[in-house]
Design a protein with these regions (language model features):
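Phosphate/pyrophosphate-binding active-site loops
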Residues: 1-128
Length: 128
C-alpha cells in the first residue's frame, strides 16, 4: 500500500541522516526519537509494535554511544505520546529532556565478545 511506501521512505531518510550525524549525540537522539515516532505512528495499535520501537530507540542510542535514559518517564507512555503528537517535531520536543537524561553504558569495561565467548558453544549458550 501507498502508506507503507511513504513510511518506508521516511524511515530510510532518517536512517541515512542518522548515519551522517553520528558524530553529534544530540542529533542522534533526535533522529532516534523521530524513528521511534514514525514507527509508533505507523502501527499504533499493533500488538508489540511499541516494544519493537523501544528496542530500536535504545539500540540506536547504545550503538551510537549516547547512553540510554535511566528509566522510562514516570506516569508517561512515550509510545502513546508519539501516537498522539501532531508532528514528529512536537514529539521530539516533548521527549528531549528525557532522552538527554541518559546513563552512559558501561560497555568499555566489558571484555570483547570474542574473549568472553571464545567457542561456538559459549556463544550459543549466551543466547539462551
Amino acid at each position: 500500500p501507498k502508506r507503507w511506501k511513504l513510511y518506508d521512505s521516511e524511515l530510510q531518510y532518517h536512517w541515512e541522516k542518522l548515519i551522517e550525524e553520528l558524530h553529534d549525540k544530540d542529533k542522534v537522539r533526535e533522529r532516534a526519537a523521530k524513528m521511534f515516532y514514525y514507527w509508533c505512528a505507523f502501527g499504533p495499535l499493533s500488538r508489540g509494535s511499541a516494544c519493537c520501537g523501544y528496542a530500536v530507540l535504545f539500540g540506536i542510542l547504545l550503538a551510537a554511544d549516547c547512553g540510554v535514559p535511566s528509566s522510562l518517564p514516570s506516569e508517561r507512555q512515550i509510545d502513546w505520546e508519539a501516537i498522539l503528537a501532531p508532528t514528529a517535531a512536537a514529539f521530539v520536543d516533548g521527549v528531549r529532556p528525557w532522552l538527554a537524561d541518559s546513563v552512559e553504558a558501561a560497555l568499555p569495561d566489558l571484555p570483547p565478545p570474542d574473549e568472553a565467548f571464545s567457542t561456538l558453544r559459549d556463544r550459543l549458550g549466551a543466547l539462551l
